[in-house]
């Protein structure tokens, strides 16, 4: 039995019901699935599993604005309203949440990793609704556990921050997940392939830039780079990064976008990547056929305005799943 795991029992769609897939919405079509069901066998074809990570403990430790614990419900509510474009050959299962208010951050990350591993065992592509960006380490661990030690797994992070901070004194938090991945790779004598899109210089200290400069395998584009380059050149940079890689894990921190587009985040951003450009880049990553799982993190509903940020996060999910389904 999975620890800290709670299957979904409540629908987030409250509109009319229509059996016609041409007019259906996500909330009508998504089906509940219990990962602890002993009768489950691997699925055939391309299908997705949506799981919430109800934790912002890492944000609290990192002195950010707490509230991301409420994000999975907020994103589900927005996603449920979107039109269903996936036909009847692709399914998105809502498998519930990882939740444990009295559990440590490390325990919850471990529980998420086991749930991700189980999804992969059932041939379901994971979609994780954070939670703080501590979500990423648990998601990454689960994906790695589903692979053999020699298998590659590149990481693309759309984020204003590197999240490569050392964690010896404070312990893991929302700003250390990719340093933990890096350290794991060093311990296993693997190269950590990591590409950050949307870095803001005023959000990262010189120690982090120095660490990146000295670390083989880590690349980044600033938000200003992306603005000047345009999406086609950004996509070519991603292609070069993914050359020779068979798998990529994608994580989207909603603080990559300006406060005008994403006001409800753990750490607001005055500058930021254009969401329209981001959609084109995300679709390109999905079209590579290498994307094995993705998450959206750091939505903070208590700080949101008219659900703008939750809706944007749901929009990214909509387009990523659509392209992944087409390239199955």
Swiss-Prot record:
Q: What is its EC number?
A: 3.5.3.8
| Organism name | Streptococcus pyogenes serotype M5 (strain Manfredo)
Q: Which CDD domains match?
A: Formimidoylglutamase
Q: Which UniProt keywords apply?
A: Histidine metabolism, Hydrolase, Manganese, Metal-binding
- This chain's protein is named Formimidoylglutamase
Biological processes, Gene Ontology terms = L-histidine catabolic process to glutamate and formamide; L-histidine catabolic process to glutamate and formate; putrescine biosynthetic process from arginine, via agmatine
**Can you tell me which residues bind Mn(2+) 2?**
159, 161, 253, 255
Q: Which positions bind Mn(2+) 1?
A: 133, 159, 163, 253
């Amino acid at each position: 039995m999975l620890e800290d795991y709670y299957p979904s029992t409540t629908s987030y769609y409250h509109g009319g019901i229509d059996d016609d897939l041409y007019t259906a919405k996500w909330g009508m079509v998504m089906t509940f699935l219990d990962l602890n069901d002993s009768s489950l066998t691997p699925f055939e074809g391309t299908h997705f599993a949506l799981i919430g990570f109800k934790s912002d403990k890492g944000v609290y430790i990192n002195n950010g604005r707490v509230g991301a614990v409420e994000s999975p419900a907020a994103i589900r509510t927005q996603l449920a309203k979107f039109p269903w474009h996936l036909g009847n050959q692709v399914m998105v299962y809502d498998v519930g949440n990882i939740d444990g208010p009295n559990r440590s951050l490390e325990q919850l990350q471990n529980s998420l990793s086991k749930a991700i591993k189980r999804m992969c065992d059932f041939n379901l592509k994971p979609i994780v609704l954070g939670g703080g960006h501590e979500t990423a380490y648990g998601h990454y661990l689960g994906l790695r556990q589903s692979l053999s030690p020699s298998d590659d797994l590149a990481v693309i992070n759309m984020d204003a921050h590197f999240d490569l901070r050392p964690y010896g004194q404070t312990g893991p938090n929302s700003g250390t997940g990719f340093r933990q991945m890096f350290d794991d790779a060093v311990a296993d004598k693997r190269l950590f392939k990591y590409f950050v899109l949307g870095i803001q210089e005023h959000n990262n200290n010189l120690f982090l830039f120095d660490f990146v400069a000295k670390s083989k395998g880590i690349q980044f584009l600033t938000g200003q780079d992306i603005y000047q380059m345009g999406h086609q050149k950004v996509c070519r940079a991603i292609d070069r990064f993914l050359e020779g890689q068979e798998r990529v894990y994608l994580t989207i921190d909603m603080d990559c976008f300006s406060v005008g587009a994403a006001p409800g985040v753990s750490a607001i951003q005055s500058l930021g990547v254009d969401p329209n450009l981001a959609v084109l880049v995300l679709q390109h990553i999905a079209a590579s056929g290498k994307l094995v799982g993705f998450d959206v993190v750091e939505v903070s509903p208590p700080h949101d305005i008219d659900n703008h940020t939750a809706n944007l996060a749901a929009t990214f999910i909509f387009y990523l799943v659509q392209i992944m389904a087409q390239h199955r």
